[in-house]
């Protein structure tokens, strides 16, 4: 029995901030963002768009009504939780109308969470082969106005349906994970934005890659020639590019180096227009590679490097199956270009707006007409979501 990703899709917010505009407003050389980070645009989520609505939109974009009745597990991987007790997956389960006899829960370990969710989903299908699991990597990266992390914000969700005999890719049994108890990036419960030791986090990302990859090579007796492409966690694409260069073997043929670079460039296309989506960033890169490459084929092995601050990293691989391209979307870039561009002033107002609750802990929200799903009100401190009628 093979297990893997049967369907994969993506959703993001309706608003976009051009980093050229942000750079000019902040008095920054635009090339520090376009070349120094390899970023162009950021998706900006309003108050009515959160990880629940993004996850519902992404999930709905790939699921049929029949599949909603077959799913028996919903996992939301996130570090942008909306409630300290109730899992975002429970909200999403209800919004999508998934059959009631299902497990729904949330997984957290910074940007690594979705990788953990995939492995849990795989184990579930191994034990229950008829099962289907919906994994939703949903996050909003919000650092604050005029902070060092401001150009690496973003919002979005990658949805993946896990099943036996998948139509996109199979998981190979070759993963190596590593844990380090460090403080490179963290967000205490009392803070709405994270604390970041940027230089240290970069060092840890790269060193975790090096050591995890070296252990992977030892365990599975392989090298980069065994892979058609490598996808990386993408807090910003330039860091992943440094990672690629760090593990490129000098003895690797130039033709192979060029191929890995070509596929890397294809893997960052969506992230360059969306920004950082934490748990979803690695898998947005994978989706970008699949939908923008003209040379991938069935049987190709793709390596993936997952990193979550704190820190947990993992190196593993997948293999494309025959007909995988039939499950993909060919107009995603056009859809991203349809987002509404914001001025920097509007971005500051929209992205950092907070609900104005009355004495009972209630607020009625508006302005969500362009969304598929929305947070429409808060009643007695309870978040109320709805599908938006068009």
Residue ranges of model-derived segments:
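Condensing-enzyme catalytic core mediating Claisen C-C bond formation in acyl metabolism
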Residues: 1-48, 147-203, 207, 316-390
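Conserved beta-ketoacyl condensing-enzyme motif
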Residues: 5, 51-112, 221-247
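Acidic, glycine-rich active-site loops and adjacent beta-strand->loop/helix elements
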Residues: 9-12, 77-82, 109-114, 137-142, ...
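Short, well-ordered amphipathic alpha-helical segments that serve as non-catalytic structural scaffolds
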Residues: 29, 51-66, 88, 204-220, ...
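Conserved catalytic cysteine-centered active-site region
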Residues: 32-36, 40-50, 80-132, 249-281
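A conserved active-site cap/scaffold subdomain adjacent to cofactor or substrate pockets
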Residues: 199-220, 225-248, 270-275
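Catalytic phosphate/nucleotide-handling subdomain of diverse soluble enzymes
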Residues: 287-336
């Amino acid at each position: 029995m093979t297990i893997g990703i049967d369907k994969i899709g993506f959703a993001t917010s309706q608003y976009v901030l051009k980093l050229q505009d942000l750079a000019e407003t902040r008095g920054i050389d635009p090339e520090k963002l376009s070349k120094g980070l390899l970023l162009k645009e950021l998706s900006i989520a309003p108050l009515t768009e959160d990880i629940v609505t993004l996850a519902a939109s992404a999930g709905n974009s790939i699921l049929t009504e029949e599949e909603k009745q077959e799913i028996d597990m919903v996992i939301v991987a996130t570090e942008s939780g909306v409630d300290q007790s109730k899992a975002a997956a429970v909200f999403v389960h209800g919004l999508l109308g998934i059959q009631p006899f299902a497990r729904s829960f949330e997984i957290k370990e910074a940007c690594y969470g979705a990788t953990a969710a995939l492995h849990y989903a795989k184990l579930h299908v191994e034990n229950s082969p008829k099962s289907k699991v919906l994994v939703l990597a949903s996050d909003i990266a919000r650092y604050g106005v005029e902070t060092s992390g401001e150009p690496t914000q973003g919002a979005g969700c990658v949805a993946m349906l896990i099943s036996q005999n998948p139509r996109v890719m199979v998981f190979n049994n070759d993963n190596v994970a590593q844990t380090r108890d460090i403080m490179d990036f963290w967000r205490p419960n009392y803070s709405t934005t994270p604390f970041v030791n940027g230089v240290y986090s970069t060092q840890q990302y790269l060193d975790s890659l090096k050591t995890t990859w070296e252990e992977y090579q030892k365990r599975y007796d392989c090298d980069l020639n065994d892979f058609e492409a490598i996808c990386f966690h993408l807090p910003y694409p330039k860091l992943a590019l440094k990672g690629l260069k760090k593990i490129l073997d000098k003895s690797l043929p130039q033709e192979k180096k060029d191929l890995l670079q070509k596929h890397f460039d294809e893997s960052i296309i969506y992230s360059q227009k969306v920004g950082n989506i934490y748990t979803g960033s690695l898998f947005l890169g994978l989706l970008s590679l699949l939908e923008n490459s003209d040379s991938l084929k069935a049987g190709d092995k793709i390596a993936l490097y997952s990193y979550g601050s704190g820190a947990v990293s993992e190196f593993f691989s997948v293999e494309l199956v025959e007909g995988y391209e039939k499950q993909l979307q060919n107009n995603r870039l056009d859809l991203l270009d349809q987002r509404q561009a914001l001025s920097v002033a509007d971005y500051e107002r929209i992205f950092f707006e907070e609900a104005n609750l009355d004495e009972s802990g209630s607020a009625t929200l508006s302005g969500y007409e362009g969304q598929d799903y929305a947070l429409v009100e808060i009643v007695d401190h309870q978040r109320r979501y709805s599908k938006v009628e068009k």
